[in-house]
Every structure is written in C-alpha cells, then in structure tokens.
Amino acid sequence: EVRALAAADKILAPNVNTVSMLKKNGISSDMIPVGIWDYRMNETQIAKIREISHAHKKENEVKIAFAGNLNKSEFLSVMEIPSDVRMELWGKLDPEREKTMADGCYYHGILSSDEIPFAVAEMDYGLVWDGSGKDEIEGGLGEYLRYNNSHKCALYLASGLPVIVWSQSGMAYFVKEHACGIVIDRLSDLDQV
C-alpha cells in the first residue's frame, strides 16, 4: 500500500490525521485532506430537517444520538451516563446485547438511511465515538476512529445537530475549524455538555 501511495501525484486523504500518518510513513506525495464525507439529502428532506430540529428541544435534558452497528460499540455497555443525559440509540443491536446497555441508553431500532436523519434531528447532539473503553477510546475500532472520517458525523451534521467527537479523532480538526460541535477527551466529559 505504501508503494502504491508513494507513486501517486496527489492523494485525497480523509483528514489531517491521515495526512500526518502517511507523511510519518514516508509518503511525500501532495496530499489534500477531504475533511468530511457528505450525506445525501434532497431539498424536501432538508426543509423537513429544519422544521424538526427547531421543534423538539427540551430544557433540563440533553439527548445525544448514536446511530450505527451498536453490537460493536462496546462502550455503550460500560459508560456512565450523567442523569440529565439520554443516549438515544438507532441501529443493529442483538436482543442479548440490548440487555447489557448502560442505564440512560434508549434503543429505537433500525431505520433506513432515508429515515434516520429525521429521527436524530430531534436530538441535541450526535456522538461520534467507538471502541471498548468505559471512558476513553480503546481497541482497534477506537484506533480506527483516529484516522477515519465517520459517516456518523456527516449524518448528524446533515440532520442539523452539533457533534461530539474524540479530541484525537480524524474529525476533531474539522469540528474545531468549523465550530460545529464539541471536542472531548473522554466520555466522562459528557457531563459538561
């Protein structure tokens, strides 16, 4: 892979973390960080998202969306969720795994990519996180988050939500640069949201 990348004149890298990693591995090609993936929606969907996102905000309660393959998101079973925070979950989740979810997690099933933006638009934030750790990013999936552009991030932003991302993730620079969310070091920082 390194040889193939080294032969390229230009590389579209997912983000600035990936650019740094490739340079450390000897790639000297010109690199352009993409920044974020898109999330396709038509004008009607965008208008509906705008209506939803302004109508469902409640005081004294923070609703955080998390969508994706919940079976691989081990942190959802061990994290400590502040009492004024609700983790609203969508995605694939085996019944046995659902029983192990942390207090404060509420599962809503699986929705299509056309339906999910409307459900998460009712939330206050979207969480981009992975790994097995109770508080910090751990494991292979967590390490992957360091270099990956998460489609979750694009979904949440397209749904009108600010995002919550790990400070060392591939999305952290984008979130800071565009002031479109909160960058945290560990899950216990959710109490500051």
Where are these regions (language model features)?
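A short, active-site helix/loop in glycosyltransferases that binds the activated sugar's phosphate group
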Residues: 2-31, 43, 169, 173-174
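Well-ordered beta-strand positions
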Residues: 9-10, 125, 162, 180
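Short beta-strand scaffold positions
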Residues: 13, 165-166, 184
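Alpha-helix capping/helix-boundary segments
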Residues: 17-20, 71, 163, 170-171, ...
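Conserved catalytic-core segment of nucleotide-activated headgroup transferases in glycan assembly
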Residues: 39-122
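Nucleotide-sugar-dependent
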Residues: 114-159, 165-173
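Acidic, glycine-centered active-site loop in nucleotide-sugar glycosyltransferases
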Residues: 172-182
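Conserved acidic donor-binding segment of nucleotide-sugar-dependent glycosyltransferases
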Residues: 182-188
